[in-house]
């Protein structure tokens, strides 16, 4: 039996996470598991609010984990990620899929994670700890808390190139 718990804050939700728990934000990955009766989890935790702000300062770009691909496309400060966000799903998926959730997407769905890795991004967890994207991706299968943001160092959009390569059907 699947149970769902709604928490007031992201920090509270982080404390509720366990081995058989999945966090629900956009739902594009978790709901697939629900629909196909994935036996690896029996509990869903969600928070009433998720950080969605996309903010640039002199040192780089901070993207809240709850920001959707559509939010990225609408943010002038996130221009460097526009080509990537445009390639993720169709409009319905881009309106739901979150930056934080895409970090957990298995091949071939984790397009954003690839670009963030190339841009030397860092992942911020609930509680404030950060780690390099490479370290995060290497251990993402181990439960370690909730992602709250992705932080990119300052980069020039005209110097970054990204291409999606996939098999044709």
PLM feature spans:
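C-terminal structural segment of proteins
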Residues: 1-169
């Amino acid at each position: 039996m699947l149970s769902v718990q709604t928490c007031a804050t992201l920090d509270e939700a982080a404390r509720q996470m366990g081995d058989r728990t999945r966090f629900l934000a956009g739902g594009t990955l978790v709901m697939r598991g629900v629909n196909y009766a994935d036996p690896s989890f029996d509990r869903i935790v969600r928070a009433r609010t998720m950080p969605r702000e996309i903010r640039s300062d002199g040192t780089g770009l901070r993207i809240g984990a709850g920001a959707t691909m559509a939010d990225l496309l609408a943010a002038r400060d996130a221009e460097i990620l526009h080509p990537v966000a445009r390639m993720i799903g169709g409009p319905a998926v881009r309106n739901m899929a979150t930056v934080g959730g895409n970090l957990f997407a298995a091949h071939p769905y984790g397009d954003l994670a690839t670009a963030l890795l190339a841009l030397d991004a860092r992942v911020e967890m609930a509680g404030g700890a950060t780690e390099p994207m490479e370290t995060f991706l290497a251990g993402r299968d181990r439960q370690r808390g909730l992602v709250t943001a992705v932080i990119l160092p300052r980069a020039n959009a005209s110097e970054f190139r990204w291409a999606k390569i996939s098999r044709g059907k």
